[in-house]
Amino acid sequence: MKVGDLKGRFFVVAHRGASGYEPENTLRAVRRALEMGVDAVEVDVRLSGDGVPVVIHDESVDRTTNGKGLVKSMSVEELRRLDAGKGERIPLLSEVLEEVKGKCVLFAELKEVGAAAPAFKIVEEMGMLDSVLFISFEQEALAAMKQLSPRSHVGLIYAKPSDGIVAAKHLGCEFVLPHYRLATEKAVAFAHRMGLTVVAWTVDDAETAAELKRRGVDGITSNYPDRILSLRKGNSG
């Protein structure tokens, strides 16, 4: 599936994989999401101490693994020795790409500006630029991605009331990802007028998801994607 295939239909994104059921940001969580039939999987990307893009949310490994320390102070080899839950390892970005290839879109959240170029290189080498949406709170990371290639698909995430929609348009984004509380009917309509696709995060109950769909949101990110997949019923094709 390509990023362009998400446009014009309602879609569901698995947050850090199906992280309500499996350890977040692991291949196990990604596979569970694929089994559910999601349209996209979102994962977090950082660099190891030796500059390899790995999939983990926090700056440190403390919360999600049995280890302690900063991701950037550990080599890939050291990171791979850790248990990220249920015996899973911290995946490489390349492993996640291999897992989703031909099955769904990948939302790769750049947790640091320095991850942009190495992540782009891997995605391009794997021939998956059309299947990956690079997203970030960091405008600089998205600007860097567009500079690396105008073909890169990018989306701006924001969690506070701001000029996020305007900023996204200026950055050359196709997507904007507001916290769901900021996805008001007015904001969604404005984003659509700017030609942006709106993805709200993170929603784990069907009632809130249905209300967001009513407001015109295009996609929803969830830790429990199976709870909201039924909202796709109105899609054509």
PLM region descriptions:
Residues 1-237:
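Phosphate-group recognition and catalysis centered on beta-loop-alpha active-site segments
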